[in-house]
């Protein structure tokens, strides 16, 4: 388990071929941070939605910033959502502990259950 702040930056081509690799990466981070299987599945679904939205919006790359600290995983990505992405946002809100989005990025926070 990670006890101090760790930051990981990852730039991924916004292509469907990279969804599986990204899901595996976030699952590994969550495992190291001590999240359980259900929380890992939620993380993988959220990260998939983010990459799918970037593909749909024809972004070239998606820049992810992961911060692990004290039972939390915070994910920032240069992915934005509009009205047509309402279902994706609802899914992400239901699966995460905290979600904010603006014109520049989306921030998702997961907090490990005690």
Please describe what each predicted stretch is.
Residues 1-7, 52-114:
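Conserved beta-strand-loop-beta-strand hairpin that lines the nucleotide-binding pocket
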């Amino acid at each position: 388990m990670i006890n101090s702040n760790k930051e990981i930056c990852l730039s991924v081509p916004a292509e469907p071929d990279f969804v599986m690799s990204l899901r595996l990466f976030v699952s590994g981070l969550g495992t190291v941070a001590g999240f359980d299987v259900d929380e890992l599945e939620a993380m993988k679904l959220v990260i998939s939605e983010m990459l799918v939205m970037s593909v749909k919006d024809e972004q070239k790359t998606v820049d992810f910033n992961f911060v692990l600290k004290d039972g939390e995983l915070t994910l920032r990505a240069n992915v934005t959502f509009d009205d047509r992405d309402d279902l994706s946002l609802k899914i992400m809100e239901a699966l995460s502990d905290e979600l904010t989005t603006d014109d520049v990025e989306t921030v998702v926070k997961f907090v490990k259950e005690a």
